[in-house]
């Protein structure tokens, strides 16, 4: 159902800035190709590990906060319709976990959030970079963090999610400061 809704919205507004591969699979889904097939066919049959699933999953984590299994399962389900590659799904899981943790721990510490996310994110490159984020001092400059973790310029989970979560951990109490740190890391 979610894939169908994405495809319908795409056909209503195809020039909204979708990524190249999103054009490919959303068009295919709209033409009747099953989403499971369409999303796996991109990138030489490996599926996307872009950061789109991670960008939209925050509310899933907040909604299911308190139920770790549900947060993880629902994050994967929301990701798989557009991101068949395990790294794209891992990024969504990590962001959902961070949102769940933050909604349960409004006065929590950034390092504790990163530890929680790291412990529960699937094994892979996204998780490896989250481990680097945890090891990096929250007092480091955003430019240093971006040099180590990536800054999202590659538009993939592996280099977007760890940096974004490091910025969030660094400024848990201030959305504005977290966003400025993210921009400073370019």
Give residue ranges: language-model regions:
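Structured, active/binding-site neighborhoods that engage oxygen-rich ligands
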Residues: 1-186
């Amino acid at each position: 159902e979610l894939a169908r809704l994405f495809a319908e919205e795409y056909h209503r507004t195809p020039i909204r800035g979708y990524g190249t591969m999103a054009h490919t699979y959303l068009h295919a889904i709209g033409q009747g190709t099953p989403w499971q097939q369409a999303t796996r066919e991109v990138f030489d049959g490996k599926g996307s590990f872009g950061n789109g699933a991670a960008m939209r999953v925050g509310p899933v984590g907040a909604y299911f906060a308190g139920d770790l299994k549900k947060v993880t399962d629902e994050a994967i389900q929301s990701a798989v319709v557009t991101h068949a590659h395990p790294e794209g799904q891992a990024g969504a899981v990590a962001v959902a976990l961070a949102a769940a943790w933050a909604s349960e721990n409004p006065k929590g510490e950034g390092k504790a959030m990163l530890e929680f996310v790291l412990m529960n994110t699937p094994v892979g490159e996204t998780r490896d970079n989250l481990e680097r984020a945890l090891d990096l001092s929250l007092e480091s400059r955003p430019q240093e963090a971006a040099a180590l973790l990536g800054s999202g310029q590659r538009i993939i989970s592996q280099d977007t999610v760890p940096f974004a979560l490091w910025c969030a951990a660094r400024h848990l109490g201030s959305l504005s400061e977290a966003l400025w740190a993210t921009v400073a890391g370019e």
